[in-house]
């Protein structure tokens, strides 16, 4: 199975995986509106891949089979200053 990956024109480091290039039929309209104009990044055979950058390959495959798409959002940023202040017992 081929998988097409698109990056969001509105949200940084947000990617949408779909089963077919330029086929967004399974993606909810509200998600597409939030995502903005999809910009093609790559098309690859997902069955041959053992891993992906950030996303869990098994979760991506399962989502593509069940829902027809997978949305990858960036992990939350860690506030190192807040963690350090908390470790020192400093409260705002």
Swiss-Prot record:
PROSITE patterns: YCGL (PS51648)
Gene3D superfamilies in alphabetical order: YcgL domain
InterPro entries for this protein: YcgL-like_sf, YcgL_dom
Domain of life according to the entry: Bacteria
Record-linked Pfam families: YcgL
Sequence ranges assigned to domain YcgL in this UniProt record: 1-85
TM stretches of this protein: none
Name of protein: YcgL domain-containing protein Shewana3_2381
Organism field: Shewanella sp. (strain ANA-3)
């Amino acid at each position: 199975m081929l998988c097409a990956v698109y990056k969001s024109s509105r949200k940084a480091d947000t990617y949408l995986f779909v089963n077919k290039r330029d086929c967004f039929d399974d993606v909810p309209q509200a998600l597409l509106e939030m995502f903005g104009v999809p910009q093609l990044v790559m098309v690859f055979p997902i069955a041959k891949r053992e891993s992906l950058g950030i996303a869990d390959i098994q979760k991506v495959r399962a989502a593509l089979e069940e829902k027809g798409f997978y949305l990858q959002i960036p992990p939350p940023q860690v506030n190192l200053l807040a963690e350090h202040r908390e470790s020192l017992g400093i409260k705002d």
